[in-house]
Amino acid sequence: MTQITNTRLQGRTWQRIALTAAAGVLGIFGAVFTVTNRASGDHLTTSDNPGKLPSALYASAIAETYDFKFGPNPFAPSNATSVTGTFIPAEMFLSSARCGACHTDAHAQWRQSAHGNAFREPFYQKNVKDLQNQKGIEFTRHCESCHNPAALFSGALTKGSKVKRPFDDDGVSCIACHSIQSATGRGIGGYVMGEPALLVKEDGTHLLAGITDQQILDDIPSHRRAMMRPLLKTADFCAACHKSQVPKELNDYKFIRAFAVGDEYQMSSFSKESPHPYYVRDKETCNTCHMKREPAPLFDVSAKLGKLASHRWPAANTAIPVFYKWPEQLDAVNKFLETDALGIDIFALRRKSPGTGPEEFIAPLNRSSFSIKPADRITAEVVITNKNIGHSFPPELRDFYEAFVEFTVTDEQGQTLYQSGFIKPNGYLDETAHNYKTYLVKLDGSYNDKHHIWRTRGIAQNNQIQSGRSDVARYQFRVPQEVAGPLHIKARVQYRRFTRVFSDYALGKSVEVLGTAWDRIH
């Protein structure tokens, strides 16, 4: 008889190999930025009054030495822009630690999140430094629009820049995210950055410099106007960065779509914005899935009934919390992965005995009794379903993430008779694995396995499962003559961040962190 277990996706740490690399670039706090007004010879400094330097003067001073390599748009080749179309003083991007004085829980969660480490974490640092070294810092504007907005808008991304960068440690900071005014839908920085402020008065006046915590507490409505708007709760807001492309300016070839999680969500059952999905699902958004309310033990001022929207944004990034040794973040990610996200079902067997007619099709297995004999040729059909994810699985950067089906057949003594999709002793994935991956191709036809997207010329394979859809993996083996007793067949989906090639490249040593959804028959 067939026994089908309940399926689930669960994060599981299998092995942690000692790391040999340090974390990326850390910010330098308390630095002074000085701009010279060349007409008068005066020096304007903002070390004592952050944000006080006039924006127009700042923008003019930066423009004098800025490399407008991609035309008059200073933020190209990203799609980001500011409300004025020009630079924003670096000091206006306040440290997130300032917010943490009152928003204690949100700040603590953000600090361990992928957003809070979007620039400094070593995997990104390795990649963006390669781009800078191979093509120039101007090209990193494409990436930094979503990994370090303050660097982009302050004009720091030009050769010989004198802009001090205390914001590097913050990545996607509180003030950067909460200052975005609108989204354009174009991806890779498809947003308009507003003028950062701590208070916005009813008449639209923006206040930042010299504002104290007490002034904020005395005028919560103005603080709310500065920090919150309906846009922040929409999928369009998240899609401003969770949608990407390789523009012609970057690869010297042509526009290539990289990923479009926002578009995938819109086409899913969860958005209620598309007539195409077959399955009916309750309305979900990016926020309701990735920012569920959780307890606020540090008494965050924004907590309601002791809870606030999680600023951990748990998803599938196990690499950052393992690298920085943050068990709380890793636990949040693991719990998120334990939800009923994927389904995997050993749905059918095809049996062909020697000397017999056509093969026999047995399905569904949980409703059929059957037996097999030595020398039978068995083909197992495994169905993998993206049940409760509002976008593709795996999403986004499939070229250096790795998801695959692990399939094993064992005898009663536990001896492996057949396997596919396993991690070899050297840490690399079995080449026969049924995997979900994007294979990028360089100009010379070789595989672009280090995420050097600026060298991408084409996509050889892009295997994934869209929301609400299924994939079938087939495995064929022959029952050994000497086998007696039942066989055990097990299938599970494994996921690791990152591929061994990329993690070794970035760190020198790898971190094995795998998540799984599984099914088995006996």
Name the predicted role of every residue range.
Residues 19-32:
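Hydrophobic membrane-insertion alpha-helices, especially the h-region
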Residues 32-46:
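Signal peptide processing junction and immediate N-terminal pro/mature segment
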Residues 9-21:
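N-terminal Sec-pathway targeting helices
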Residues 139-153:
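Long, hydrophobic/aromatic-enriched structural stretches that serve as scaffold segments
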Residues 1-11:
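N-terminal secretory signal peptides that target proteins for export/translocation
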Residues 43-90, 106-139, 155-457, 462-467, ...:
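Primarily the internal scaffold of c-type cytochrome electron-transfer domains
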